[in-house]
Structure formats: structure tokens, C-alpha cells
């Protein structure tokens, strides 16, 4: 009999961490949730009202405004865009949902840019 020990999948661990955190935080109409998803090639941010189940504002590296630069530079532009779009809709305070990722690198760059452009969290 052969026993195979495999390493845990990093994305599965992240999803488990995200589910655990999502049980504790939720977005409302007054203070929606700023959700971040990070892929190998891009970064996506959404401002979500969980009560109504509606996305209020979003931005990603797929937008035409975001194309050049390193992934971290793109994350800064995405943070700026999502903050501008949220502020334009009258949203000033959000709950930051890092999506189970470490608050470091691209996620931190996006959060800092969103703060600089008018979002409070």
C-alpha cells in the first residue's frame, strides 16, 4: 500500500479563510463591502450591498483605463477607479474585504489608493 501526502492547495486554503471572514463581515446600503479578488493576471474590486445583493460600483484590470504598468501599479489604478465610482454614487464608508488574501502587495496597494481617493475604512 502506497501513501501519498500532498500539499494543501493554496487557493482552497484562501477560500476557507475567506468563508470564515465573510461570516463576520457584511455590507449594508449605508456601509457596503469593498471586495477584492486577485488572479495571476489581474485584480478586481467591487463595492457590494449584501442586504440587497447588488454591486454598487466596480473596477478591474479589464477596464480600458487600466492597461499599462506592473501588477501593483495596475492595482493602484483599480483602487483609484473603484473609489471614484463609489464616491460618485454617494458612498464614502465601506467595509474592506480582502478576500482571504494577505493585506500586502497588490491588495494593500489597492486599499491605499482607495483611501487616498475618498473611501473610509
UniProtKB/Swiss-Prot annotation:
Chain positions covered by the region annotation Disordered: 1-25
UniProt keyword RNA-binding present: yes
Keyword annotations of the record: Ribonucleoprotein, Ribosomal protein, RNA-binding, rRNA-binding
Comp. bias regions, Basic residues: 13-23
GO biological process: translation
Gene3D superfamilies registered for this protein in UniProt: 3.30.420.100
GO cellular component: cytosolic large ribosomal subunit
GO molecular function: 5S rRNA binding; structural constituent of ribosome
Matches recorded under PANTHER family: 39S RIBOSOMAL PROTEIN L18, MITOCHONDRIAL (PTHR12899), LARGE RIBOSOMAL SUBUNIT PROTEIN UL18M (PTHR12899:SF3)
Function comment: This is one of the proteins that bind and probably mediate the attachment of the 5S RNA into the large ribosomal subunit, where it forms part of the central protuberance.
Entry's family note: Belongs to the universal ribosomal protein uL18 family.
Subunit structure: Part of the 50S ribosomal subunit; part of the 5S rRNA/L5/L18/L25 subcomplex. Contacts the 5S and 23S rRNAs.
HAMAP family: Ribosomal_uL18_B
Protein name in UniProt: Large ribosomal subunit protein uL18
Organism from which the protein derives: Streptococcus pyogenes serotype M4 (strain MGAS10750)
Amino acid at each position: 500500500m502506497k501513501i501519498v501526502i500532498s500539499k494543501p492547495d493554496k487557493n482552497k486554503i484562501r477560500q476557507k479563510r475567506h468563508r470564515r471572514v465573510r461570516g463576520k463581515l457584511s455590507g449594508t446600503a449605508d456601509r457596503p463591502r469593498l471586495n477584492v479578488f486577485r488572479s495571476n493576471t489581474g485584480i478586481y474590486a467591487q463595492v457590494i450591498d449584501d442586504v440587497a445583493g447588488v454591486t454598487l460600483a466596480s473596477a478591474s484590470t479589464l477596464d480600458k483605463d487600466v492597461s499599462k504598468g506592473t501588477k501593483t501599479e495596475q492595482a493602484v489604478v483599480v483602487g483609484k477607479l473603484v473609489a471614484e465610482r463609489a464616491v460618485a454614487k454617494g458612498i464614502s464608508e465601506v467595509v474592506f474585504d480582502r478576500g482571504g488574501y494577505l493585506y500586502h502587495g497588490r491588495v494593500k496597494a489597492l486599499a491605499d489608493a482607495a483611501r487616498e481617493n475618498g473611501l473610509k475604512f
